[in-house]
């Protein structure tokens, strides 16, 4: 292997988008993925929404209260496992430090800037390559069950995105925006419609990226596990996989929640930890009437998204480390969420055929991704997007590729730099 080739660790959204961005800048790349197929972790069956209009981290003061109130509760939208507290202690202190209202608003603005940039790049590649991935550009609808929550969300939107187009809806407006909500609209105090948001299947997008990367000369190796990143005198000089030793002077770690462990072996502390999320995907083919908008119930951090002839219920946040158990209460929670939002649809679906899934979101301690150069020469990071991985993917990749190739970025990369201090 030519040591000028850049090794990208991770074949999910971040890794594949980075590979494509580097190829467009004239670089040679090889993507290494430990699973049998690309995009098998957080990219596989996520909520399927791109939300530049309200890309906010999960470290608001109110979210902190939800997390603390969910300690040990499997039926809570946000769960903190007592067993995971020791491993999350120092990360948690940094998370709390960034949860003041001032920090939350500042970080949210940074997220929204990157999200808007990312959306433009997503639209660009879709138009150029003719990508189709059950995508729709018809916005998202956030619903509220209390006036206080709605008022707070409207206020935050006006502060963070004063020029963005949003529609504040009453219960009648909700029914007009999404007719399938008509039966529950009287239970809602209102909603916010964000016309600039999009939906799409992240896994299908990744498969299209995979094909595109290969067509441009990039290599993608699946079933290839990284054992070690080789460092000599503060510089990258290769990686050891379970297949071979690859010589390279540049490595991008885009391994999601597993990035922390890979970097720990080379003496770097990355404040990114896994936050477990769940989804349930059901077939809606043949139904005469079905939802057209992604609907987000902000009170429980859950979204219901139409993706072609499927509907996906996704959400919840478990701070449990790499816990691979699928608790029955989570399946019931997702079913009950669908029933509460779309009772008519719920009664028509074959729940036995639904596909349950969980993944680990790579959550940074401050809510922003870590992008670019580390203190080790030739070692770069693209990780920490958390629940905004789909929303931030193309923009994150472009910034990392610009940093690697010394190209002037289109937006300020400083808030997201890998070497920032928390």
What do the predicted segments below correspond to?
Residues 106-119, 142-152, 192-211, 325-330, ...:
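Short beta-strand to alpha-helix junction loop
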Residues 45-172:
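Dinucleotide-binding Rossmann-like beta1-alpha1 core, especially the glycine-rich loop
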Residues 4-31:
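N-terminal Rossmann-like FAD-binding beta1-loop-alpha1 element of flavoenzymes
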Residues 46-49, 54, 58-98, 226-236, ...:
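Active-site substrate-recognition segment that forms the wall
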Residues 4, 181, 231, 368-422:
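C-terminal lid/capping helical subdomain adjacent to the catalytic/cofactor pocket in oxidative enzymes
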Residues 24-44:
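Glycine-rich FAD pyrophosphate-binding loop
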Residues 151-161, 184-242, 246-249:
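Helical element adjacent to the flavin cofactor pocket in flavoenzyme catalytic cores
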């Amino acid at each position: 292997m030519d040591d000028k080739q850049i090794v990208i660790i991770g074949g999910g959204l971040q890794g594949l988008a980075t590979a494509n961005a580097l190829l467009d800048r004239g670089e040679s790349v090889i993507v290494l993925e430990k699973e049998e197929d690309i995009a098998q972790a957080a990219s596989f069956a996520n909520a399927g929404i791109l939300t530049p209009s309200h890309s906010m981290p999960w470290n608001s003061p109110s979210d902190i209260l939800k997390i603390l109130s969910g300690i040990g509760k499997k039926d809570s939208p946000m769960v903190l496992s007592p067993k995971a507290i020791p491993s999350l202690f120092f990360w948690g202190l940094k998370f709390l430090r960034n949860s003041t209202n001032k920090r939350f608003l500042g970080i949210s603005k940074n997220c929204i800037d990157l999200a808007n940039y990312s959306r433009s790049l997503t639209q660009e590649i879709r138009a150029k390559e003719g990508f189709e991935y059950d995508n729709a550009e018809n916005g998202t609808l956030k619903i509220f069950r209390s006036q206080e929550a709605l008022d707070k969300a409207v206020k935050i939107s006006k502060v963070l995105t004063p020029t963005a187009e949003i529609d504040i809806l009453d219960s009648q407006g909700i029914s007009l925006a999404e007719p399938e909500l008509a039966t529950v609209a009287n239970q809602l105090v209102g909603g916010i419609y964000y016309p600039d948001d999009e939906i799409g299947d992240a896994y299908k997008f990744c498969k299209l990226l995979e094909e595109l990367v290969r067509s441009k000369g990039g290599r993608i190796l699946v079933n290839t596990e990284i054992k070690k990143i080789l460092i000599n005198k503060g510089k990258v000089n290769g990686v050891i996989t379970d297949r071979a030793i690859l010589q390279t002077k540049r490595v991008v770690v885009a391994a999601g929640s597993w990035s922390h462990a890979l970097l720990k072996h080379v003496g770097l502390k990355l404040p990114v930890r896994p936050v477990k999320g769940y989804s349930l995907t059901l077939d809606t083919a043949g139904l005469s009437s079905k939802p057209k908008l992604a609907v987000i119930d902000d009170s429980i951090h859950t979204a219901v998204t139409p993706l072609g002839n499927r509907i996906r219920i996704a959400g919840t946040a478990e701070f449990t480390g790499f816990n691979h158990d699928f608790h029955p209460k989570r399946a019931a929670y997702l079913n009950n969420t669908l029933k509460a939002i779309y009772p008519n649809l719920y009664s028509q679906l074959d729940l036995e055929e639904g596909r349950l899934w969980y993944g680990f979101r790579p959550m940074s301690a401050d809510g922003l991704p870590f992008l670019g150069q580390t203190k080790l020469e030739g070692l770069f990071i693209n990780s920490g997007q958390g629940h905004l991985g789909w929303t931030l993917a193309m923009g994150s990749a472009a910034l990392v590729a610009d940093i690697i190739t010394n190209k002037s970025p289109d937006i300020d990369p400083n808030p997201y730099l890998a070497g920032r201090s928390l």
